[in-house]
Amino acid sequence: MFDLVNGLPAHALVVHAVVALLPLMSVVTVAFVLRPRWRRELPWAVLGNLLAAAATYAAMESGEKLQGRLSNPDFEPVAQDHGDIAQYLIYFALAQFVVSLIVWLLLRTRDEAPRTSTPKLATSLVLTLAVGVAANAWTYRVGDSGAEAVWKDTIASTNQ
């Protein structure tokens, strides 16, 4: 299931969803927290963060399938390093989903005018920012190591 899509490694396709969705959803969640009129749309942020977590899981599984297919001894250490870093991204994605769910539960109101207490708002903002920054930093780190694994030698050979 996570191996190939139309004869190509699924990992090469799925990682783009992670690299786009995880940072996007952290920004969207912060925006929904900051804008009172948008808070009623927080369930969409929760759903988006769930999709980002699912994409992260698919990237992790497809990466393991791809690593199993590669038998180049020169590539193995770089791929192993990438896999070692990438295995933790799912925890950041799940944390972002859980925080968006908690924030939605904290900030939802029964009436149409979204009002919240300052402590709830401050807690929501701090949680959202902290997890979002951590998730984005780790996404960058994983993406950078993956890009280096795939492209470093190819690009180096064009500089000669």
What kind of feature is each model-predicted range?
Residues 1-160:
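Polytopic transmembrane helical bundles with strong interfacial aromatic enrichment
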